[in-house]
Amino acid sequence: MSASHADQPTQTVSYPQLIDLLRRIFVVHGTSPEVADVLAENCASAQRDGSHSHGIFRIPGYLSSLASGWVDGKAVPVVEDVGAAFVRVDACNGFAQPALAAARSLLIDKARSAGVAILAIRGSHHFAALWPDVEPFAEQGLVALSMVNSMTCVVPHGARQPLFGTNPIAFGAPRAGGEPIVFDLATSAIAHGDVQIAAREGRLLPAGMGVDRDGLPTQEPRAILDGGALLPFGGHKGSALSMMVELLAAGLTGGNFSFEFDWSKHPGAQTPWTGQLLIVIDPDKGAGQHFAQRSEELVRQLHGVGQERLPGDRRYLERARSMAHGIVIAQADLERLQELAGH
């Protein structure tokens, strides 16, 4: 699937139509209807919001991973209530999003009761944008922080070989009078999916994103993908955050570190088999003024000092456009999706 439809014939589909199409694709290619529901909504949401590196661009990777037997598309997550503020989920070698969905209501109940709750997911495959995992909590007035480790492709600061994954972190918080503050970011200098897109489109990357197989700086995306590696953002600072993600998303949850799984016997596998941690906070338990109002005051001050666009603003604008006018997809991509759905 292409990530851009510039200079290509396009078609427009509604958000519900895209969800339905993707759902049928996942079922045809080996997931249960329940898993298909969750994955289709996640993928369609990314496409709707302009997060093209995690929208329909990801479908071939999902399907090749399913076909290889690497991930169980019919896995039923096992939710374990292990403490007043702690929930564990064994994803049973399935996708991470259904594991989160299975535990969400219990996690929210615990957060509202104790003021904070932790969800530790292990044995999971996360192949999607991370912001959809935290946004629903922010919409319910909660603060959420999530992190997931991925496959080895990032050289730690000062090291000679890759060890970490891109290891993204997502944050969501309610805001009075506006959309929730929601963003995610890779702890690598650039997301791995954006490198793949640049390679397909024949574009050079900005300097400082990665190295080739000899450890030399390169702006060629294919050199990074062909035996090279990404760099952490911000040098030692991003490297330290990536290490934190490994410890919390894998070490704490019981999932694999980014370097611990081996998919060599599953040709076509692309989904990292690792872990995920979520921390959910009920801000009403905090002191002072209403948290959402304080969030709005911070936003007002940011605008006052000249920051015109906040993290997530572009995504919300694209969402509004897509919901009003439909999601624009390259005609060739839509036809391919319809073929995959069995049309």
Curated annotation (Swiss-Prot):
Q: What catalytic activity is recorded?
A: L-pipecolate + NADP(+) = Delta(1)-piperideine-2-carboxylate + NADPH + H(+); L-proline + NADP(+) = 1-pyrroline-2-carboxylate + NADPH + H(+); N-methyl-L-alanine + NADP(+) + H2O = methylamine + pyruvate + NADPH + H(+)
Any known activators or inhibitors?
Is inhibited by the substrate analog pyrrole-2-carboxylate, and by 2-picolinate.
Q: Where is substrate bound in this sequence? A: R58, T166, H192, G193
Q: Which UniProt keywords apply?
A: NADP, Nucleotide-binding, Oxidoreductase
Q: Per the record's keyword annotation, is Repeat included, yes or no?
A: no
All disulfide bonds of the chain are none
> A Pfam family name for this chain?
Ldh_2
Temperature-related activity data read: Optimum temperature is 30-45 degrees Celsius. Is stable between 0 and 35 degrees Celsius after incubation of 30 minutes.
Q: Which GO terms describe its molecular function?
A: delta1-piperideine-2-carboxylate reductase activity; identical protein binding; N-methylalanine dehydrogenase activity; NADP+ binding; protein homodimerization activity; pyrroline-2-carboxylate reductase activity
Residue numbers annotated as active site: S53, H54, D194
Any idea of its EC number? Answer: 1.5.1.21, 1.4.1.17
Key word NADP present in the record?
A: yes
Gene3D superfamilies referenced in this protein's UniProt entry, alphabetically: 1.10.1530.10, Hypothetical oxidoreductase yiak, domain 2
* Function comment: Catalyzes the reduction of both Delta(1)-pyrroline-2-carboxylate (Pyr2C) and Delta(1)-piperideine-2-carboxylate (Pip2C) to L-proline and L-pipecolate, respectively, using NADPH as the electron donor. Can catalyze the reverse oxidation reactions, albeit at a much lower rate. Is also able to catalyze in vitro the NADPH-dependent formation of N-methylalanine from pyruvate and N-methylamine; can act on other alpha-keto acids and specifically uses methylamine and not ammonia for these reductive amination reactions. Can use NADH instead of NADPH, although with much less efficiency.
* Similarity comment: Belongs to the LDH2/MDH2 oxidoreductase family.
This protein's assembly is summarised as: Homodimer.
**Protein's name according to its UniProt entry:** Delta(1)-pyrroline-2-carboxylate/Delta(1)-piperideine-2-carboxylate reductase
